[in-house]
A protein has these predicted regions:
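Active-site glycine/GP-rich loop and adjacent strand/helix microenvironment
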Residues: 1-52, 60-67, 75-78, 82, ...
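Active-site diphosphate/adenylate-binding microenvironment
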Residues: 27, 31-95, 106-111, 118, ...
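Non-catalytic, beta-rich accessory domains that mediate macromolecular interactions or localization
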Residues: 84-85, 104-115, 238, 245, ...
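Conserved helicase ATPase motor motifs in RecA-like P-loop NTPase domains
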Residues: 96-102
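Short coil/turn connectors at secondary-structure junctions
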Residues: 105, 141-143, 242-243, 269
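Long, hydrophobic, well-ordered secondary-structure blocks that form the structural core
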Residues: 108-110, 114-120, 247, 270, ...
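Short, basic alpha-helical nucleic acid-contact segments in DNA-binding proteins
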Residues: 123-128, 289
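Conserved AMP-binding loop of ANL adenylate-forming enzymes
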Residues: 129-178
Length: 508
C-alpha cells in the first residue's frame, strides 16, 4: 500500500460530509450565521449594532450595514495597534496585505486564529479531500508539494501586528507536519524578491519528487520556466515525472492553460481551481470535468449577494444564498470570523447550479468597461480571447483593456493591450474575431457596436515581451497575489503601460 492510500483514509469522512453538505447548504449557512453572531456579541462592533438582540437573518440585515474596506478601516487600524474585542473577540495578530483602495496603497485584512483554522486551512484540506475523491489512484503524498507563496514583513511600523501576503501567512502558521511534504524551505518561500525566489525554488526542487504544485497561474508559470532553464529539460514532467495536479487560484486559468499543457505533457496531469483570497476561502472545483466551483458553506463565512444590475443603487437588493438564481451576475458579500461584517469583497460570481450551489467567478465589481453602456466583464473578455486565440493559433500571456472615450476623429472604442507568447497568424483577423465574439456573448456590447454608431471596432495594441512583468516590477509587485488589472473604466493604468511599451505597434 502506497503512502497516499494510507494518508487518504484520513480524508474519507470529510468526503462523505461534503457530499451530504451539498444537499443542506442553506441550513449550514444559517448555522454559520448564528455562530458568528454569537461571537460578535462580545465585540465593540457587536455592541455598536446591538447584536445581542439579533436572532434572525432579517434582523441581521437590518442591524448591520453593507461595508467596504473604508468603512471598517478605522476599526482595523485600532486592531493593528493591539486593541482587542473590536471586530472580533480577542486580539488579531496577522493581517493579509491586499491591493489598495482609492484612498490607500494597501488594505490590511484581519486574519484571526479562528479564520485561519475554520476558513483558510479548512479550504486547503478540502482541496485535497475533493481531489482524492476525483482521482482515487492519486500518488500525491508519495512525493512533495511545491507551494508558491508571497512574502511577509514583521510590521508596517505597527509593533502589535504582522503583515504579509495571505499565502505567506499560511506558510508561517502551517502545521509543522505539512513541512515534511512541502517545498521550498520556509526561508526561500518567504523571500520578498520574486526573481531571486524563483531561481532558488528551481534549484531546491531539482531532483525532488514533486507530485503537486499550488499557486497563482502567472507566477507559477514563471517558476516552471526557470525550472526548465536550470534543468536543461524541455518539459516539466521530465524534471518531475510524477507531477499530477496543479491547485490554482487568484486569476483565471484559461489564458494560461495552453502554456501549461505545452510544458507539462503528462496525460495524468490535472488542474483544480480554487477560490481563495485574503478575505477567505470560498470555493473549490469539486468535479474535474466541470469548471464550476462548489460554494463552501460550512466554513466561518456567511454569504450574501447583490445583483450587479442593482450594485450602484443607493439601496441595492441583498439576498442570502437561498435567494440566488442561475445565470445572474452577483457581487459577493461576506461575514466572517475574521471580523469582516457584511463586507463587499469586490468579486462577482454567477451560479451555474443551485443543487448543489456551484458558480464561476465572472470578474470584479470595479474591473469592467461600461463607458457606453456595454457592460463588458472579465468573463466576456476571457471567452473572447479564448475564441480568437483558438482560431488564429495564438497564445495570450497578459492583457488589459480600457475605453478610448473620443479620439481626434470623435470616435469611441475599446483599446486592448495584449502581450502574446505566440503571435496570431493574422493580427487583423484576431482583432476581428475578438470583436465579433464579444458581440455574440454580450448583447449590450453588440447593441453599442451596431453600425459603429456608439462604439467603433476595438483596437489591439501589441505589447512588447515582458511589458507587464516590467510594469509590475516597477511597482514592487512581483510574485505573491499581485496581478495585472484586466479591465478598467478609466485609462490611468493602460496609459502607464503604453508608456512602458516602447516601439509598440498599433494594429486594427
Amino acid at each position: 500500500m502506497n503512502l497516499t492510500s494510507i494518508v487518504g483514509k484520513a480524508f474519507k469522512s470529510r468526503q462523505k460530509e461534503l457530499l451530504l453538505h451539498q444537499q443542506g447548504a442553506v441550513a449550514l449557512q444559517h448555522n454559520v450565521l448564528r455562530n458568528i453572531l454569537k461571537q460578535g456579541q462580545n465585540t465593540e462592533y457587536g455592541r455598536r449594532h446591538n447584536l445581542s438582540s439579533v436572532n434572525t437573518y432579517q434582523q441581521f440585515a437590518q442591524s448591520i450595514p453593507l461595508n467596504t474596506y473604508e468603512d471598517l478601516k478605522g476599526d482595523i487600524d485600532r486592531m493593528r495597534q493591539g486593541e482587542k474585542d473590536i471586530l472580533w473577540p480577542g486580539t488579531v495578530q496577522w493581517y493579509a496585505k491586499s491591493s489598495g483602495t482609492t484612498n490607500d496603497k494597501s488594505k490590511f485584512i484581519p486574519v484571526s486564529k479562528a479564520g485561519l483554522k475554520n476558513i483558510h486551512y479548512k479550504g486547503g484540506s478540502d482541496c485535497v479531500s475533493l481531489y482524492l475523491e476525483n482521482v482515487p489512484n492519486s500518488r500525491m503524498f508519495d512525493g512533495k508539494g511545491l507551494i508558491l507563496g508571497g512574502s511577509h514583513s514583521p510590521n508596517y511600523n505597527v509593533k502589535n501586528s504582522l503583515v504579509g501576503d495571505l499565502s505567506a501567512i499560511l506558510i508561517e502558521n502551517i502545521n509543522p507536519l505539512v513541512n515534511f511534504v512541502r517545498v521550498p524551505k520556509k526561508q526561500t518561500a518567504l523571500l520578498s524578491d520574486f526573481e531571486v525566489k524563483r531561481k532558488l525554488i528551481a534549484l531546491e526542487t531539482l531532483g525532488k519528487n514533486i507530485t503537486n504544485i499550488s499557486g497563482v497561474p502567472s507566477w507559477m508559470l514563471s517558476v516552471l520556466v526557470e525550472v526548465l532553464e536550470q534543468s536543461k529539460k524541455t518539459t516539466i514532467d521530465e524534471v518531475w515525472p510524477n507531477i499530477e495536479v496543479f491547485f490554482h487560484g487568484g486569476i483565471a486559468f484559461t489564458p494560461y492553460r495552453k502554456q501549461y499543457e505545452q510544458i507539462i505533457k503528462s496525460p495524468n496531469m490535472h488542474y483544480m481551481e480554487t477560490y481563495n483570497a485574503s478575505e477567505g476561502f470560498f470555493g473549490i472545483q469539486s468535479d474535474l470535468s466541470d469548471s464550476s466551483m462548489l460554494l463552501m458553506c460550512d466554513y466561518d463565512v456567511f454569504y450574501e449577494f447583490i445583483p450587479m444590475s442593482e450594485f450602484y443603487n443607493e439601496r441595492p437588493t441583498v439576498i442570502p444564498l437561498e435567494g440566488v438564481e442561475v445565470g445572474v451576475n452577483y457581487a459577493m458579500v461576506i461575514t466572517t470570523s475574521c471580523g469582516l461584517w457584511r463586507y463587499i469583497i469586490g468579486d462577482t460570481i454567477s451560479f451555474t447550479s443551485i443543487n448543489p450551489y456551484k458558480f464561476k467567478i465572472t470578474g470584479r465589481t470595479k474591473s469592467f468597461i461600461n463607458a457606453f453602456g456595454e457592460e463588458l466583464i472579465i468573463d466576456n473578455a476571457e471567452k473572447g480571447l479564448a475564441y480568437a486565440c483558438k482560431a488564429t493559433n495564438a497564445e495570450v500571456k497578459e492583457y488589459t483593456a480600457a475605453p478610448v472615450y473620443m479620439d481626434e476623429n470623435a470616435h469611441c472604442r475599446h483599446q486592448w493591450l495584449i502581450e502574446f507568447t505566440r503571435f496570431p497568424d493574422d493580427i487583423s483577423h484576431f482583432t476581428q474575431l475578438l470583436d465579433k465574439h464579444l458581440q455574440e456573448i454580450n448583447s449590450d456590447y453588440e447593441a453599442k457596436r451596431f453600425n459603429d454608431i456608439t462604439l467603433q471596432h476595438l483596437e489591439v495594441v501589441v505589447a512588447r515581451e515582458n511589458l507587464f512583468h516590467d510594469w509590475l516590477k516597477s511597482k514592487g509587485k512581483l510574485g505573491g497575489q499581485h496581478k495585472v488589472p484586466r479591465l478598467n473604466n478609466e485609462r490611468k493604468i493602460i496609459e502607464e503601460l503604453l508608456q512602458y511599451n516602447y516601439n509598440s505597434e498599433v494594429k486594427d
